[in-house]
Amino acid sequence: MLRHQSNYQILDLVGQGQFGRVFAAVELKSGALVALKELKTKQLSTSSFLRELTFLVTLDHFNLVTCKALEHGYNQRYIVMDYCEGGTLRSFLNNSPAISLNQSLKLVIDILSGLKYAHEKGIIHRDIKPENILLKTSDRSYTAHIADFGIAKLKQEIDSQNILGNTGSPAYMAPEQFYGEYSYNCDLYGVGIILYELVTGNRPFSGMPKELVAAHLSQPVTISADVPLLLRLAISKSLEKLPSRRYQTAAEML
């Protein structure tokens, strides 16, 4: 709950992030729509809260959900963020009967553009999936914006320590992530899964977590011949089992 003296009024619950609920709200002074990400003190450590806040305030790119302010409530803290009226890419995939190839490619280009910027800042997102991609509407089309940097890590931190704990979502994780190994192309592997899902309507692998682990580690990716050849090649390269055989940078995949 917000304080009585708050600068914002909550309108509705619009989503659930990894570390808290997300509300649509209005800034009382300007009337602008914003998103408030609730971070409950008892559910989120100060270090985790400060980590995401630090990443958000230092990142400034059109295809990243950025931080506008910090708001305090009763036993809660809120990050004030860009409002993305199109919802999540997951909802879009679930509710859209068909997504054009052009729209699919545009969304992936948006995601890669945001990752290129984040990677240049030394940040690996580590949890690229449709639930963490928010959409804005623009000229009868959609633009994609990467959200939820809650488990992101600086490359220099990953190089200097063994990363355990929250590591991502099994359906979108690169094989080496299951062993606690990360690089920039782990994020690109997740983009490859999203691209596959956009153009085929399904993920390349499905099942329970243990089945997903086995599939990512050893099962070949099959792509319908209906998918254009150049796109099949791009998907195949992004989903190689060995990191060295994948795209090494977002710029290369672009």
Label every PLM stretch briefly.
Residues 74-88, 92:
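Conserved short submotifs of the Hanks-type protein kinase catalytic core
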Residues 70:
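Activation-segment/catalytic-loop signature of the eukaryotic protein kinase fold
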